[in-house]
Design a protein with these regions (language model features):
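PEST-like, low-complexity acidic/proline-rich intrinsically disordered segments
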Residues: 1-16
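Extracellular or lumenal secretory-pathway regions
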Residues: 21-355, 362-552
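Intracellular C-terminal tails of type I single-pass membrane proteins
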Residues: 550, 554-560
């Protein structure tokens, strides 16, 4: 009985254990086990991925930091640093500028010049014309009125690049009136010389008898006066006379224009085809110098066999040559003056923290040349300080000078009174950055005068004005600074870039030397370690061999 009870209990416990096993095998417990398995697999996979990523990083790091790569980088950095010391980034920029590639900043700035040039015009009012014609005053007296301010707009178009490393384009200049900057009433009247009549008489003073007879008839018919009253606007833009208009209708070949307005004549034909030098083959000194003007190398209107002056080597004033020195002479071409104007180094100065050079127009620019090659003289000869400009104005008797006859060989009261020459107000100069040839400020001041020849063959009132030079007006072309983007670019290129390039080049050199030195030191250290290991192993091998021989010897002796 006791055995049966025990057997029953054992069966119960067995069944209980079986039930508990059944409960463990239910679906919930199975899913838990599967999730735990998934989690374990995920963790293992993540750990494996991390390990693989670390391995790849270590491999890349090992590749990047390998001795061969370090050696290549070291040599490359040293070569780059030496090259940057020899050929600096500034040299590269100046060389690239020579090509004038469309889309690059130098070309874009030139193709659309900034509106920075102001034209200030001053006219002369005659105050004693009646007394002068009556013989009460020996000389005319003039007073200056102005300025009348315009913006001179410059347009570049029709650009084409030639095979001989030159660039041809069309340059057009025209003025735009600026009412906000003007205090002069253009409707105000002034007394001025009758430029059309006096100019035609002076132009034809050596004409034949028939031509002079026609002119006398016109004078008798219209009875013009040597001095007239006109508005300032008409004097500048619409100045004519019935005698001039009739003369042009009768003999248009002798009288090419009927409107003698001062600015009207200056800007009547100011669309010019220019050809300039570009490209590395010309070098920095000849960059953007004029090679042809309207297809010709000489100044327009002059005979190349008589006048040795050539227009090539000059500049229109927008861009100058690069790498200028204090010994360089800048040739400035302005059709208004009809001659090349030389500028010489004057002083060093700083504007906007940029070191600059100032070049002044020679005070002898209008003097006579004594070697027989004076292209700007007339017959009879002009006074020093005057330059013939008639070749650019249909042979009309016009001469150029400094404003108020400043400097030159003309005393200020030689022809008229009332002039007040002042070096500060009447000289011309350009201030530019010498490496890039960028003009920061430029002022060109010129005076136009009427040259009156001997008029004794006409009425007495005209004869009184004979053999004189009458100031008509003078103009100032002033480039007032630069746009901020150009100024900042020049500042960075000249002031910031050179020391910055030295720092970068020096840093590259030091890093290259460091990499090579480190590599050499590491190789020497590895060689020493290898030698030590080989020596240690060889010593161990010898000791082991000695021990083996000793053991074999001892065994042999015992056996014996």
């Amino acid at each position: 009985m006791s055995s049966e009870k025990i057997l029953h209990e054992d069966n119960g416990s067995s069944s209980g254990s079986l039930r508990s096993d059944d409960s463990d095998s239910n679906p919930d417990s199975a899913s838990d086990s599967l999730n735990s398995l998934y989690k374990t697999n995920d963790n293992t996979c993540a750990e494996n991925c991390i390990e693989e990523t670390k391995c790849e990083v270590n491999k890349k790091r090992g590749t990047c930091c390998s001795p061969v790569v370090q050696c290549v980088w070291g040599v490359l950095l040293i070569l780059l640093s030496i090259g940057s010391f020899i050929f600096t980034p500034l040299d590269f920029m100046l060389l690239e500028k020579l090509n004038m590639r469309p889309g690059m900043p130098p070309y874009e700035w030139w193709s659309d010049p900034p509106d920075e040039v102001k034209l200030r015009t001053y006219v002369f009012n005659v105050t004693n014309h009646e007394r002068f014609l009556l013989g009460l005053d020996q000389k005319l007296n003039v007073e200056e009125i102005g300025p009348i301010v315009y913006l001179e707009k410059l347009l570049h178009s029709n650009v084409r690049f030639n095979e001989n490393s030159t660039m041809t384009y069309t340059a057009k200049r025209f003025p735009i009136y600026l009412p906000d900057l003007n205090n002069i009433d253009l409707n105000a009247t002034i007394i001025v010389p009758n430029v059309g009549v006096l100019g035609i008489f002076s132009y034809l003073h050596n004409a034949n008898y028939f031509v002079k007879t026609v002119l006398r008839s016109l004078v008798s018919m219209y009875n013009p006066e040597p001095f007239v009253q006109v508005s300032i606007y008409d004097y500048l833009w619409n100045f004519t006379d019935p005698v001039l208009e009739m003369s042009r209708s009768l003999v248009p070949g002798l009288v090419p224009v009927s409107n003698t307005g001062m600015l009207a004549r200056v800007y009547a034909d100011f669309t010019d085809e220019m050809t300039v030098k570009i490209g590395p083959q010309w070098g920095h000194k000849e960059f953007f110098q004029i090679d042809r003007f309207r297809g010709q190398p000489q100044i327009p209107g002059f005979d190349p066999d008589v006048c040795p002056d050539r227009i090539f080597g000059s500049t229109e004033g927008v861009m100058y040559a690069q790498r200028l020195t204090k010994q360089d002479v800048l040739q400035y071409w302005r059709k208004t003056v009809c001659k090349l104007m030389p500028l010489y180094f004057d002083s060093e100065l700083t504007m906007f923290n940029v070191p600059l050079y100032r070049y002044n127009l020679s005070e002898n620019a209008f003097d006579r040349v004594t070697n027989g090659t004076d292209c700007y003289d007339t017959v009879p000869s002009l006074h020093p300080g005057l330059s013939d400009t008639s070749k650019c104005y249909f042979d009309f008797p016009m001469v150029a000078s400094f404003p108020h006859f400043y400097t030159g060989g003309i005393p200020k009261d030689k022809f008229v009174t009332g002039l007040k020459p002042d070096r500060y107000k009447h000289n011309s100069f350009v201030i530019l950055e010498p490496y890039t040839g960028t003009p920061f400020e430029a002022v060109a001041r010129m005076q136009s005068n009427l040259l009156v020849h001997d008029l004794t063959g006409f009425q007495e009132k005209f004869a009184n004005v004979s053999n004189s030079v009458i100031p008509l007006f003078w103009a100032e072309y002033h480039q007032e600074g630069l746009p901020s983007k150009i100024r900042k670019t020049v500042y960075f290129s000249i002031v910031i870039l050179p020391p910055l390039s030295i720092i970068i080049s020096t840093t590259m050199l030091l890093i290259g030397i460091y990499l090579l030195t480190k590599l050499i030191y590491s190789n020497n250290l590895e060689n020493d370690s290898l030698k030590s290991i080989l020596i240690f192993k060889s010593k161990n091998n010898i000791a082991n061999k000695n021990k083996m021989l000793a053991f074999e010897k001892e065994t042999f002796l015992k056996t014996s």
